[in-house]
Amino acid sequence: NVPVIIGKCNDPKHKDDNLFGVYEGVYTDDIIKYLEKSKNKYYKILTTPESFQKVKDAFEELEMSAHCSCFLLFDECHKLVKDADYRNNITLPIDDFFKFDQKALVSATPIELNDPRFKEQNFQTIEIQPTFDYKKEIWLHHTNNTLQAFKDTLSKLNNEEAAPLPICVFINSTDIIYSLMKQLDLLEDSAVFCAPKSVDKLGRNKFTNAYEQYSIDKMKRYNFFTSRFFNAVDIELEQKPHVIMLTDVYFAEHTMIDPYTDAIQMVGRFRNGVSSITHISNVKEGIPQRTKEEIKGYIVCSKEIYRTMKNFYDCAADRASRDAYRAALESLPFNKMLDRNGRENWFAIDNYIDEELMKNYYYDKGSLNEAYDNCDSFISYQHGFYYSIGDFERLKRENKSQSIKDKRKEIVRQLEMLGDCVTEMELEYKRDLIAADSFIVEAYDTVGKEVIEQLKYSKKKITEAMIQKQYSEKATGTEVIRLIKNSFTVGQ
């Protein structure tokens, strides 16, 4: 991606390597100029998949054959699968890739590729195994409350060190990142490295330390990275940082981290090593679990349904029927597994399989433990961080589709779970509930759950009960006026 290309091209180590980066904002004419002035040198073009067409156009303009004269290397080729669901153009160069005389794909965390052209062209898999012990220790912090677990993890790290080390946090959600920084009062001491749109989004919240390109001088005590920086970027620090990965499946499923690819890549960013690795995660038993065979069976069935509907579309007798069948075709699941020409997109299919298998890891803590235990790159240790109220309760409280009455029922249920609120953590939870609905929290503190339920959550009746309770305990002289105001609306 762009940060990697810019980083490589600007690296002093490569100043004599004749590198040329191609991405958004670099045009065909720029590539032509580079090719013309590099006639007696090796061409070394680094391009995003989305900009590959500009490289092709430049070669064609100069009547040169890139297929014959160049070696095409797909670096970090696991991204062809991992990003296929949201970067539709990442596979654009793949048809050209198979036309090159000399070509290869490389990755430290490869994923099985099922495109039949690999077999047709007799591709070989070459695996390089280190001769040294490369396993790293990782702590899995299982929790029902990612915010509080993150806070406690930071507190532990800060208390253990005389000279604080950088803390690098990988979360694929700028919404979660901003929430963590704000709630834990880290805004002044944090930097965020993310996509340009996310930089703008954070800017609208008055946060100015957000960047689309990484550089060491932009780092702070706490450094947050989204998926744009999970792979290939070289982070060379004099100190060995603490690495924290965070997954919140309740807030955003796309924060799931794959132990076999994502986790390895994140740790691999730090060329001089790390001090510790922690993965904080909740789990969600509602996530469907499927075997690889079941997932493939679903794809086969989806394909047959698509073919049947496509046949109806092709045989439709009139325009109205064709429009109806076209709409049906576009809504079918298999439609997402086709390229722009209507052919099977094998990388989209591989992506679906990979994503569905990854969901299995987050069904329960045992599944995630097993995934890390089976990964050759880590030695995992587990620790539980469980609290009175967690992410599931937050999700239920923040559900915008529920009625006010249902929301208040949920808040009362959570107040019951909290009890007397003796710890600072419990007081924080209660402040969150007050922010969500101060009336029902005050009502609970004044008249209690039983009275609220007897009055069937009627705001008018609960308010009367609160006034009467306060009068019986300590009269202020204003109770009658308050009761009248509660019973009548001005102007009616």
Q: Where are the regions a protein language model picked out?
A:
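Conserved strand-helix element at the start of the C-terminal RecA-like helicase core
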Residues: 1-9, 45-49, 153-185
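SF2 helicase catalytic motif II
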Residues: 48-52, 60-104
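SF2 helicase motor core recognition
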Residues: 34, 51-64, 107, 216, ...
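The feature captures the C-terminal accessory region of ATP-dependent helicases
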Residues: 297-492
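Conserved helicase ATPase core of P-loop NTP-dependent helicases/translocases
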Residues: 198-226
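Conserved SF2 helicase motif VI
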Residues: 250-277
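Conserved Walker A/P-loop ATP-binding site and its immediately adjacent core
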Residues: 1-27, 49-53, 111-114, 173-175
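Interdomain hinge/linker at the junction between the two RecA-like core domains of SF2 helicases
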Residues: 108-156
